[in-house]
Structures are given as structure tokens and as C-alpha cells.
Amino acid sequence: MSKNTESLISQLLDAAGAAGADGADAGMSRSEGTSVTVRLGKVESSERSEDIGAALRVFVGKRNASVSTSQLDSDSIAELAERAVAMARVAPEDPYVRLATAKEVAGTLPEIDLYDDAVPAVEHLTETATAVEAAALSNDGITNSEGGSASHGEAHMMIATSNGFSANYKRSSQGFSAVVIAEKDGAMERDYDYSVAVYGADLDAPEDVGNSAAKRTLSRLGPQKPPTGQFPVIYDQRVSGSIVGTLASAINGAAIARGTSFLKDSMGEQVTSAGLTFIDDPLRPRGMASRLFDGEGLPVARRAMVEDGVLKSWFLDIASATKLGLTPNGQAARGMGSAPSPGSSNFYLENGDLSLEALIAEIDEGFLVTEMMGSSVDMITGDYSRGAGGFWISGGKVSHPVSEATIAGNLKDMFKAITRANDIDMRKSTAAPSLRIDGMTVAGS
């Protein structure tokens, strides 16, 4: 983090004090990125972006307010602080929100490998975007392309508080993708594939990703609506992270404190199939959501949220922990446009032993989901319904593509009916292997 950025965040805190705040904390992000898009072998766009943003939270007695800005000249900083304090003075009292104390904040920060200093040139990004699209277009049956793209970005993150805490880190990311189209009997289908990682060396080969995008697209031709009834459903690892994400929402401390989660009374109880362990790991080297401290400056640690199917912990920030009578556990997330709130980092379900093919082979009639559309999830009751596409399974084998399907169930039952495969992609921030869930309602024809 540059001296200029450190100076800016100090100015924010000083301005808050001058405006009458009893305390304040601030977060700042400075990011830059480059992206290239190629379509049918020609460069369509090449863009460079630079952004800076800051969020300020002020405390006046038991009242608080949060504001954000991208205007960081001296006058704008002073005006922002004055506005925040004015907002706090008329806000309702909240006895649960406070600054982290000196004893709570992170001391010596962990060393995590989050930054790749090998920055790709624009020419390299162009070559990658061209290669991934060309590989996809080389497949027979692919008739058009929506483009190949490649990008690189890095961000510098900093948090500081008026009681002396200040820390920062930087992270990088790279990725590329291809989206292509196939046509059969006048009907078109499209699909994509991508690769993204913190380090360029961890990316898949562009040719492999392009060929995968083509294969996925071609396999979707001639879809049918599925039958309606109760069937086992397999979530391909491409979409299985959505199930992990719903669990994260259900054990979010803010929802528990409000009483708006169907798992609010389930601490210490079995909430998933036995043998399943869900980990939140902010310290994963090269993790897409790794962090050295949480959004309020607290130290972070790898934590089993669900162990052997039993719920062990909530995602907590200071406010939700205080309201629940618990100790904050360093799981506050912070965006530049919002106050800290509980949130996951690298959250995943540990791998199983079975292959995806083995999961499929055990099913007489069922649905392999590879695409999700829309969402209707009631976190109070656990009722779940989503649009889906993928493939019908018949006699233990993939039979034909499926579209215009709806899958439904209740998350309480779904979590306890999970059988996992062994194909997790740990580069994702929310990840799981392919998952089989029995007894789902499938609606189609």
C-alpha cells in the first residue's frame, strides 16, 4: 500500500474525529485491471481500469453510520466525515455495534501467497483470448462465437481504526474464458468455460478451456423437458458451490441474530449428512477469497463450520456475536460500499471418494444439473426452487440434454441427503465436489 493511500485513510479517521465522532474505522481499496476481448479472431476491446474507493464507519455514543466514496481530495474527505457524523447522530442506538478493541485486533499478520508479481502484458492477454476462442471454434458443429476474453487484475486492501489498528495486503487474479454457439435444426445453444486463479501458473491451458466450452455447447443440442416427479439430482461441481453458498447464508450470524434462518436453533445438531465437513479457510495460499484479517481488523483462522454433519459455528462479526452472547470469530467481510457484516472467505465442502461417473452409475432415472437459472430460496423456511438445465440420466448413464426444468426441495432435507464426489476445484472461493441429492422434485413436461 502506497504512502499516499496510508495518508488518505489517516485523513479519513482524522476528519471523523474532527467532525465529532467518538471513534471510527475505515477501509480502502485501490484496484487496477486489464482485459481483452476477441471475437472471431479480431480484438473487439482492450481496456485498462483503475479504481479507488473508501468506506468510513463512525460512532457517536451508541449510534453509528457508514458512508463510502471514490472522491478522496481533502475537501471531499472532510465533507464525507461530516455527513457520516450527522447521519450517526440521528440514527437509532445500536448497543451491539462497536470498534474492535486493541486486544481483539490482529497482531502479527500471517504470510499468505496472494500476489503474483508476474504481470501479463496486453499482448499475452490478447494471445490467450485468441487461443481460447480459436480452440473452441476448431470443433466441428460450433457455428459462432460470442468471444474469448482474458484479464488480469490486482487490488490493494487496507483497514485502519481510530484506536490504532492499521494493516494492508495486496492480491492478484487472472483468468480467461470462451463463449460459443452451436446450431441444430434451426435451434441454437450456447455455453462457456473459463479458468481463473490468483497465479497465472495455476490456470488451465487455453486450448483445454476452449475445447471444453465447445464440448459443453455441442452436448446441449436437442434438449428435452424432463419428466415431472421425485428423482435424485446431481449438481455438477460447476454449480455445486451454490449449495455451499446457501449453507453459508443459513449460518450467517446476522441472520441467526435476527431469527431469519431455518437453522437458527440448530447449533450442535446434525444439519447435513454424516461425514460431511464444511471448512472456511481465509488462510489458504493462493485462495481467491483469502485474507490476512477480517473486515473489522480481527485475526482470521481456518475453521470447521460443520464437522461430520454437526453444526459447530456461525459466521460472526462483532455485532452479531455480541447480540448472540458469543465471541467474535474473525469472519466479518467488508465491501467498500457497506459496513462490515458476517461473511465467508474460502468456504468449501471437503472432497469425497466417489467419481462423478460413480454417482451417475448408481441412478436409474435422475437429473444431472450443469446450469442454474434464477432462484427462489426462503431462508426462513428452507424452501428451495431453482430453474435448471443439464442432462437426464437413464440406466446409470447420461441420456440426453435437458432444459426448462425446475428443481425444488427443502434445504433441511437436502443437506441431509448429500452424497459427494471427489472432483472439487479448490481454486473457487465457494466450492464443493459434484453432489448427489436424493428425493428432489423435478418439474418439466
Regions found by a protein language model. Give the residues of each.
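Dual-mode signal for accessory low-complexity, basic/Gly-rich regions
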Residues: S266-S445
